[in-house]
């Protein structure tokens, strides 16, 4: 299981997701360009000292990420407000990569159509979306539960 961040533009969210990945043993793919420098103090503060333990792969562009990903046997699972299936109804597999879009704009249509599945988190009427880090944590938790992928107790 991996978590991919498409051109993240809020350093605190990216840092929080990298901390989540480090703590749960889930690799993180950063698809650049980012809206901040990876040396940004807000990014480092959110990730704290967990960043040293995170499995982080940086990709210079969507095309480079997609090329690398296509060589794997995994599925690309997009979390989107325009999803066609609720995340809790989806059957996750250990080789899945969960993809979240930019906080400000989501992902372009070409990325949307490249995903093997497009999942949505149901919200109350009139609510647009959750924070990207919160949404990723919710769905990652369900994916790890389904695949028995949580790390063992220390």
Where are these regions (language model features)?
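Post-transcriptional modification and biogenesis factors for structured RNAs
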Residues: 1-154
């Amino acid at each position: 299981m991996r978590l991919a961040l498409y051109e993240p533009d809020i350093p605190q969210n990216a840092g929080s997701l990298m901390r989540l990945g480090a703590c749960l043993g889930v690799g993180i793919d950063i698809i650049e360009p980012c809206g901040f420098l990876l040396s940004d103090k807000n990014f480092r503060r959110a990730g704290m000292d967990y960043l040293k333990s995170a499995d982080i792969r940086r990709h210079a562009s969507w095309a480079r990420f997609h090329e690398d990903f296509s060589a794997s046997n995994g599925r690309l699972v997009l979390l989107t407000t325009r999803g066609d299936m609720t995340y809790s109804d989806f059957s996750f597999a250990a080789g899945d990569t969960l993809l979240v879009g930019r906080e400000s704009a989501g992902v372009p249509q070409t990325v949307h159509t490249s995903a093997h599945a497009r999942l949505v988190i149901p919200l109350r009427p009139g609510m647009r979306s959750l924070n990207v880090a919160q949404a990723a944590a919710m769905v990652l938790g369900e994916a790890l539960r389904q695949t028995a992928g949580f790390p063992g107790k220390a």
